[in-house]
Amino acid sequence: MLNALTEKRTRGSMLWDYLTTVDHKKIAILYLVAGGFFFLVGGIEAMFIRIQLAKPENAFLSAQAYNEVMTMHGTTMIFLAAMPLLFALMNAVVPLQIGARDVSFPFLNALGFWLFFFGGIFLNLSWFLGGAPDAGWTSYASLSLHSKGHGIDFFVLGLQISGLGTLIAGINFLATIINMRAPGMTYMRLPLFTWTTFVASALILFAFPPLTVGLALMMLDRLFGTNFFNPELGGNTVIWEHLFWIFGHPEVYILILPAFGIFSEVIPVFARKRLFGYSSMVFAIVLIGFLGFMVWVHHMFTTGLGPIANAIFAVATMAIAIPTGIKIFNWLLTIWGGNVKYTTAMLYAVSFIPSFVLGGVTGVMLAAAAADYQFHDTYFVVAHFHYVIIGGVVFGLLAGVHFWWPKMFGKILHETMGKISFVLFFIGFHLTFFIQHFVGLMGMPRRVYTFLPGQGLETGNLISTIGAFFMAAAVILLLVNVIWTSVKGEYVGADPWHDGRTLEWTVSSPPPEYNFKQLPFVRGLDPLWIEKQAGHKSMTPAEPVDDIHMPNGSILPLIISFGLFVAAFGLLYRSDYAWGLPVIFIGLGITFITMLLRSVIDDHGYHIHKEELPNDDKGVKA
């Protein structure tokens, strides 16, 4: 009985610890769990899509249900799965890579997570409250303004809440990388995952405000009767396209750049070579970020903007392939001549190269404005997009999860299960999407819930569906791997791969709450590798052992986010029910009173005294 009470108390305290944490490592786990959950939700929606399209005139889903599932699949995967899973790895790794004890603003870090989480929950509650959004993940104004029910309203309000969390996270990482680097960690000594996080965070800072403006205008149109996008009353639907895509295309680079950073960490470790062309890689990252804001109109070649606009954006789109090509060749030259160890993470990294190149080639094909009239709104675009996002972002996430899992949890994922999962996923991915290039060229439009027999589309769609089941099996095996590792996996040391090059591999696995007992002194690029080559057993400390200041946990980020969650329901049902307006004020009251409490209550954190630090933990082991 006593043991049961103790276990219950322990579970309760662990739950409270995660609800109130401001520790970047625990917030990384929260992002990983929430993002993983939404990834499974988006995957189930994808399976529904592929089952519906497995044969002509299938009745597995109705037209309306298909539109809702298709819309929520794209929205969930982009905003609620890929982004938070990348934030999980950023939170887990970036402070360690730069030799910091936490991010610049731990409280805001927690707030960013809870805003994302409540925004995602709000969006998915639409399934149970009258129907999900049904206008596609791009929610073009001509469709969304005339959508019945509240599905689009859930889309607009949910994305505004979660988008605010993303914007906060981007600002936080910018401040962290600028201000929290260890002594000697100059910009040109930053690991490339940190560099890509830095540039992606800058893109977030400039890309998300246009989306926020567009969502706000759509909210005003739908809930308050304005006409920004209604052409019948002087509005312009093309304004929505511009606002969405000037966010939407940088969003692709917000996703792919951190994945590039992951590959740039994984490949040198398992090729056992220094990354080829570090300076050119940094240049390419910055150039991709800059050019990413100059190509959004290639999504709008068929809207009638004219040949001059189309030509300018076509050239800019083709130009962005140049820095990407630089990165591809540098990764190949890093592998060339290396003593390559093919772990699961390395398999994902190596397979990414041909997969992503194929996605890039079809991207350049789509950049030809004249040809785009044939490709536009067909499955050719669907195939291109998924080759970039799955072949780039998802492969990067899977490589990063296998690579840094032991750093986050202290145990290595089972390699045999990991490799079987990789083979299933790789085969399933190419089975699903390669054939879609040809299905699209044969004329199959995207976003349609069925197709007629006798058009030559049956075989291609069936192959795509079979491939999707391979991918589903791979994800299930990955979940089995995670459970098996948590139960039976063995604990590992600071550098489980034995060839770690950067500072995260100098601390224990998982790291202590304070990360570094003494901040390390960085003597060059790949600082741990430098110390290993010099025969040193530990990093050179940059400071004497002293008391370590730590931030207190807080429940306030969760309460602030919950207040906006409540207010969103009031705004949604304001015109339907009398309780809508009071609920708005209650929700905003919760948020603003909590913010006021945060402002007036002094919270100076606490100190871990140097006498409490373990003597055997140097904090910066090599």
From Swiss-Prot:
Sequence positions that bind heme a3: 384
InterPro entries reported in the protein's UniProt record: Cyt_c_oxase-like_su1_dom, Cyt_c_oxase-like_su1_sf, Cyt_C_Oxase_1, Cyt_c_Oxase_su1_BS, Cyt_c_oxidase_su1_bac
Residues that hold Cu cation according to the record: 249, 253, 298-299
Enzyme class label: translocase
Cytoplasmic side: 47-68, 129-159, 216-241, 305-312, 367-374, 442-459, 573-580, 605-622
Known function: Cytochrome c oxidase is the component of the respiratory chain that catalyzes the reduction of oxygen to water. Subunits 1-3 form the functional core of the enzyme complex. Co I is the catalytic subunit of the enzyme. Electrons originating in cytochrome c are transferred via the copper A center of subunit 2 and heme a of subunit 1 to the bimetallic center formed by heme a3 and copper B. This cytochrome c oxidase shows proton pump activity across the membrane in addition to the electron transfer.
Record's protein name: Cytochrome c oxidase subunit 1
Organism: Bacillus subtilis (strain 168)
Gene field: ctaD
